Amino acid sequence: MAKKGKKYLDAASKVDRNEHYSVEDAISLAKETSVANFDATVEVAFRLVIDTRKNDQQIRGAVVLPHGTGKTQRVLVFAKGDKASEAEAAGADYVGESEYATKIQQGWFDFDVVVATPDMMGEVGKLGRVLGPKGLMPNPKTGTVTMDVKKAVEEIKAGKVEYRAEKAGIIHASIGKVSFSTEDLVENFNTLQDVIAKAKPASAKGTYFKSVAVTTTMGPGVKVDTSNFKL
């Protein structure tokens, strides 16, 4: 394991590893201990007590954060005709059909999110082995397979984030930048936490939020007190 630098260790020393902080205090401390020399991303990790091997306990979705993420998302839309025109008018960065499928197969990935109308999924489905491992495959659960491409593009541009529980039941997501106010980050956090709480599978019994931590790019993790989380 690589040794941590003095700057990181100094920052980490401000965090009590045995303490579980309120959401506001955790975010404030994460901002204070950011060690990056750029506007770092503020991230949250939710460890859930679920079994993702069971189909009814696979959690995936998307939510528009009230204050966005601070990141400009490049959107590629697979659509044709009027729907292509709608996507362009809504601000999509790239709109097309098979020509973009060919570019992707040739190694082009200058985009962050892919949206597709249902009739284009036959074309997009062929890219599954390429887009899937990168988490870029459109999915109805995240609103990226839809006829309402205008809404999809506008929400993504406004700060929509996707969330998905990994094998260990952990959801990683960005809730903004260090430059955001603590209040805005708290509102983003609460919005994400609320939608994950509402997604609790009926078959998941007992404790749901096993642990939660807030961190910044390259910064130390700060544990969050989950005792007041609503379910």
UniProtKB/Swiss-Prot annotation:
| GO biological process, alphabetically ordered | regulation of translation; translation
- What keywords are assigned to this protein? Repressor, Ribonucleoprotein, Ribosomal protein, RNA-binding, rRNA-binding, Translation regulation, tRNA-binding
GO CC terms, sorted: large ribosomal subunit
GO molecular function of the protein, one example? Answer: tRNA binding
Assembly and partners? Part of the 50S ribosomal subunit.
What is the role of the protein in this entry? Binds directly to 23S rRNA. The L1 stalk is quite mobile in the ribosome, and is involved in E site tRNA release. Protein L1 is also a translational repressor protein, it controls the translation of the L11 operon by binding to its mRNA.
- PANTHER family (alphabetical): 54S RIBOSOMAL PROTEIN L1, MITOCHONDRIAL, LARGE RIBOSOMAL SUBUNIT PROTEIN UL1M
The family classification in the record reads: Belongs to the universal ribosomal protein uL1 family.
Please state what the protein is called.
Large ribosomal subunit protein uL1
Q: Which organism is it from?
A: Staphylococcus carnosus (strain TM300)
Encoding gene (name): rplA
